[in-house]
Amino acid sequence: MASSVMSTATVATGANAAQASMIASFNGLKSAASFPVTRKQDLDITSIASNGGRVECMLVWPPINKKKYETLSYLPDLSDEQLLKEIEYLLQKGWVPCLEFETEHGFVYREHHRSPGYYDGRYWTMWKLPMFGCTDATQVLNEVQEAKKAYPQAWIRIIGFDNVRQVQCISFIAYKPEATKFSMFNV
């Protein structure tokens, strides 16, 4: 019986030696000298992590009588040439242009939904049908002009709809009523 116990211990010791050689021992951290050191040479104000130097040139959006419309709506109104470029972009992407208008609330407000952000439960009225098969940006711009004549006091936006993924991919204001045109710089 003693011989059987010894042989088991000998086998176990041999297995432990094999396992120990399979796992490398921890040698500590590598020295910092092996890593390359890169430092910025010029230390101008744009390389500082804080934006403290740029605070003086920033403007705050005035919350009184300044409504939030769509993405980038704080920019000046788009000219016809700029609208054509935006429309050409959505046509190049293969999206279907569609016009929508709103006669009462062209801005974000909370009527049916309480979550923050753009999705507030409001719906715009579609102008005619989506322009399936449209390949000319001037056709879309002509529809914007027609909508302006029919509803001069309405907000008009152009959306680009991807009919494969069935999602709205782009949306921007094409026209704001005269009473709401303002500049954030004329406070």
UniProtKB/Swiss-Prot annotation:
Predominant location category: plastid
MF-aspect GO terms: ribulose-bisphosphate carboxylase activity
Residue stretches in coiled coil: none
GO biological process, alphabetically ordered: photorespiration; reductive pentose-phosphate cycle
A Pfam family matched in the record: RbcS
Family: Belongs to the RuBisCO small chain family.
Protein name, per record: Ribulose bisphosphate carboxylase small subunit, chloroplastic
